[in-house]
């Protein structure tokens, strides 16, 4: 490998028309594109202040930095960029390059000789230490180092570069004549940033060190903040391989390769790139030069720590624990408290299912504050809040803790953690069943602008927090029957987080769940069953639960019961309280649909106790709703009504539309059952009130297109109208019932046994 390095760096060579200078000395080389940029700079200095307006000069100055730092682009693209900033100068540059390319070699020689004049005089046009001055000096020095044969090859490459640009310009002109699209001629804001696109990368030769550093930092920033604007995984890997071919010891390129491989879940390649990164970091002496032998040890312990994080991401917990132990051992030997704090945080992640994990987390937060590590301290507080939320702590205490965390965020401008904090508040309010508060927090996050500079015109980062908030927003709209709005949110999610991005699984699961609920509401159980496979692939527990729900709806009670019992045991082991309560409610429904309401009562009481203990208000209200229904079946409607008064307020305030309809339908059933013992005037009044509640329930069910429940409601209304002697209203409801009954399948379940 060493011989390859020597042939690459110490013997200047020509590859694809690009002349390399001594990389260790100059770390830059002359290319046809850079000659074109030099022509632009020369023309700018020759053009008087009156010839170019102040606005045009400002646009040109903004354009220069990305042109100097970015990779080589085609000549036609360069013309277009200059023309958008200053059309007059673009014409001058085009003429100058044409004269040079169609002239003789001495024209290029003379051009480089004249460049030195920019620094002469008492008031030079360009300062030597400025960005432009350094670029000019690098190019002059790199050109002066070339042999005659290399100069000739460079001139040949310039001619080829010009000819390719001319061909492209002619093709674009022909296309404009055939179809003139005003929108395409306008430059987008991201084009002003000269962001690296695939066609630009493919046309460029080997990058200089500055170009490579700019390319890597730009792509790393895009992968973190807006993955959709980064190169595709295949294109990025191709460019990184090209970089590493010319400089195998470029450590940062190996790290970006590691991040790129994580995008496609390639565990082998990502591990390979990560290990190469730390190997090259040690070999190049980047750490040891500044820190002596300490730098070598630092690389080793952070290599082990990153390896542990990588294994944890892929679910290899045993390997992650071994790597973490190695990192802790090396950090303790070096007395590196910062590394030990990171290790402590990862220890919590690996052992968070243990009963004593909160002690570890509290210790981690205290130590992080002590050593002045606000990022780790804040992450620890948020993890602690999440753990306490699942443990059933009160919302006010959790919000106070998050407020303390937010103070750290704003004090240290940790914008990423501000987003995470708001997304966490959204999730906590939904966990507690307060959909209005969750909606408010989600909208707050989406209306916030990022504190970090992303791209021109982009105010937000495409991070996990935004994906979580948008998913909550879609689900909340779907719960309220606003399916068109939910579809718009999901459409935005798909555009913002494409299927191959790392956070795409969030919206995929959200989309599948919404489709499943709609299919169940519409009575299309075969369609719902087909969606279960997709849900299971994304979340196995959710998938098994949904499968049981479908089986139950299809009257396959024994299969549903077996599945729910297995799921109950599994969720109790995992301490997934929310799912345990949902499973208990489903099992209870199985029992009363099998005409065994007395067996359902212990299940419901257990679910109520859990929801009260963990302060899951909405699930508690739903459990009370089920208890009231059980009491109705057992023949005590008065007690059922009194129970309903306890549960109905949270459901009407924060519940899903379907649950609101179920609650009002149950109230009507209880009113009718209670009215049996009333005298005639009072009974008629109670039945009228029941009909009003049934109308409200029908409106709720209509919003979510739940035809089966609408059929049950109109059947019940027809019976009540018949009792009250209202023939016309009875006939209208009976006709509607008949239409729905012919359209929908009937499973023969008695109406009284269906909540």
UniProtKB/Swiss-Prot annotation:
Sequence positions bearing Phosphothreonine: 232
Pathway: Protein modification; protein ubiquitination
One GO cellular component term noted in the UniProt record for this chain: nucleoplasm
Location (main, coarse): nucleus
Compartment(s): Nucleus; Cytoplasm, Cytoskeleton, Spindle
BP GO annotations: anaphase-promoting complex-dependent catabolic process; cell division; positive regulation of mitotic metaphase/anaphase transition; protein branched polyubiquitination; protein K11-linked ubiquitination; protein K48-linked ubiquitination; regulation of meiotic cell cycle; regulation of mitotic cell cycle
Assigned keywords, A-Z: Cell cycle, Cell division, Cytoplasm, Cytoskeleton, Mitosis, Nucleus, Phosphoprotein, Repeat, TPR repeat, Ubl conjugation pathway
A Pfam family reported for this protein in Swiss-Prot or TrEMBL: ANAPC5
Record's keyword annotation contains Repeat: yes
Phosphoserine found at: 195
GO molecular function, one term: protein phosphatase binding
TPR repeat extents: 209-249, 250-300, 301-337, 338-378, 379-418, 419-466, 467-500, 501-540, 541-580, 581-620, 621-660, 661-696, 697-736
Family: Belongs to the APC5 family.
Domain notes: The TPR repeats are six to seven residues longer than a canonical TPR motif.
Function description: Component of the anaphase promoting complex/cyclosome (APC/C), a cell cycle-regulated E3 ubiquitin ligase that controls progression through mitosis and the G1 phase of the cell cycle. The APC/C complex acts by mediating ubiquitination and subsequent degradation of target proteins: it mainly mediates the formation of 'Lys-11'-linked polyubiquitin chains and, to a lower extent, the formation of 'Lys-48'- and 'Lys-63'-linked polyubiquitin chains. The APC/C complex catalyzes assembly of branched 'Lys-11'-/'Lys-48'-linked branched ubiquitin chains on target proteins.
Subunit structure: The mammalian APC/C is composed at least of 14 distinct subunits ANAPC1, ANAPC2, CDC27/APC3, ANAPC4, ANAPC5, CDC16/APC6, ANAPC7, CDC23/APC8, ANAPC10, ANAPC11, CDC26/APC12, ANAPC13, ANAPC15 and ANAPC16 that assemble into a complex of at least 19 chains with a combined molecular mass of around 1.2 MDa; APC/C interacts with FZR1 and FBXO5.
Protein name (database record): Anaphase-promoting complex subunit 5
Lineage per the UniProt record: Eukaryota, Metazoa, Chordata, Craniata, Vertebrata
């Amino acid at each position: 490998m060493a011989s390859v390095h020597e042939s690459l760096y110490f013997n200047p060579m020509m590859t694809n028309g690009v002349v390399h200078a001594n990389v260790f000395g100059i770390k830059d080389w002359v290319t046809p594109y850079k000659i074109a940029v030099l022509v632009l700079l020369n023309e700018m200095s020759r053009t008087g202040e009156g010839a170019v307006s102040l606005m045009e000069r400002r646009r040109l100055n903004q354009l220069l930095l990305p042109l100097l730092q970015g990779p080589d682009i085609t000549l036609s693209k360069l013309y277009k960029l200059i023309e958008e900033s200053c059309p007059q100068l673009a014409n001058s540059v085009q003429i100058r390059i044409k004269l040079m390319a169609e002239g003789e070699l001495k024209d290029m020689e003379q051009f480089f000789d004249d460049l030195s004049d920019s620094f002469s005089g008492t008031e030079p046009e360009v300062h030597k230490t400025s960005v432009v001055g350094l670029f000019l000096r690098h190019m002059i020095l790199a050109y002066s180092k070339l042999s005659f044969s290399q100069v000739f090859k460079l001139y040949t490459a310039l001619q080829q570069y010009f000819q390719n640009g001319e061909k492209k310009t002619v093709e674009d002109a022909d296309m404009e004549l055939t179809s003139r699209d005003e929108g395409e001629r306008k430059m987008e804001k991201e084009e002003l940033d000269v962001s690296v696109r695939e066609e630009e990368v493919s046309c460029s030769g080997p990058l200089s060190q500055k170009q490579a550093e700019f390319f890597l930092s730009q792509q790393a920033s895009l992968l973190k903040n807006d993955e959709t604007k980064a190169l595709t995984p295949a294109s990025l890997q191709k460019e990184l391989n090209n970089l590493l071919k010319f400089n195998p010891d470029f450590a940062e390129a190996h790290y970006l390769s590691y991040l790129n491989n994580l995008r496609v879940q390639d565990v082998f390649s990502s591990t390979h790139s990560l290990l190469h990164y730390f190997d090259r970091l040690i070999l190049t002496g980047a750490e040891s030069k500044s820190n002596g032998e300490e730098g070598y040890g630092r690389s080793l312990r952070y290599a082990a720590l990153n390896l542990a994080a990588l294994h944890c991401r892929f679910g290899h917990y045993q390997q992650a624990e071994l790597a973490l132990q190695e990192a802790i051992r090396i950090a303790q030997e070096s007395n590196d408290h910062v590394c030990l704090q990171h290790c402590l945080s990862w220890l919590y992640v690996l052992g968070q299912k243990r009963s004593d994990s909160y002690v570890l987390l509290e210790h981690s937060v205290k130590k992080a504050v002590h050593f002045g590590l606000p990022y780790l301290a804040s992450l620890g507080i948020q993890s602690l809040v999440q753990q306490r939320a699942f443990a059933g702590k009160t919302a006010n205490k959790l919000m106070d803790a998050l407020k303390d965390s937010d103070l750290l965020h704003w004090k240290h401008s940790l914008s990423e953690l501000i987003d995470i904090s708001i997304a966490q508040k959204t999730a906590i309010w939904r966990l507690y069943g307060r959909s209005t508060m969750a909606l408010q927090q989600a909208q707050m996050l989406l209306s916030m602008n990022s504190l970090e500079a992303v791209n021109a015109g982009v105010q937000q980062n495409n991070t996990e927090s935004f994906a979580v908030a948008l998913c909550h927003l879609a689900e909340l709209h779907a719960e309220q029957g606003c399916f068109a709005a939910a579809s718009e949110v999901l459409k935005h999610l798909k555009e913002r987080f494409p299927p191959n991005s790392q956070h795409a699984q969030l919206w995929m699961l959200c989309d599948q769940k919404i489709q499943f609920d709609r299919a169940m509401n519409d009575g299309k159980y075969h369609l719902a069953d087909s969606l279960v496979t997709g849900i299971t692939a994304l979340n196995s527990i959710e998938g098994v639960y949904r499968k049981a729900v479908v089986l139950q709806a299809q009257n396959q009670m024994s299969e549903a019961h077996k599945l729910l019992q297995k799921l109950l045991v599994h969720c109790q082991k995992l301490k997934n309280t929310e799912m345990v309560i949902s499973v208990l409610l489903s099992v209870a429904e199985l029992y009363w649909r099998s005409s065994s309401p007395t067996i359902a009562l212990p299940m419901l009481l257990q679910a109520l106790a859990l929801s009260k203990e963990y302060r899951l208000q909405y699930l508690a209200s739903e459990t009370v709703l089920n208890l009231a229904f059980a009491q109705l079946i057992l023949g005590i409607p008065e007690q059922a009504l009194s129970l309903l008064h306890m549960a109905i307020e949270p459901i009407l305030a924060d519940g899903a539309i379907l649950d609101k309809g179920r609650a009002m339908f149950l109230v009507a059933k209880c009113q009718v059952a209670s009215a049996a013992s009333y005298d005639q005037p009072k009974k008629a009044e109670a039945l009228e009130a029941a009909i009003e509640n049934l109308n409200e329930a029908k409106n709720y069910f209509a919003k979510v297109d739940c035809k089966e429940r609408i059929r049950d409601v109109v059947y019940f209304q027809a019976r009540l109208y018949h009792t009250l002697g209202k023939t016309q209203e009875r006939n209208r409801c009976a006709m509607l019932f008949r239409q729905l009954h012919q359209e929908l399948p009937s499973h023969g379940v008695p109406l009284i046994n269906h909540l």
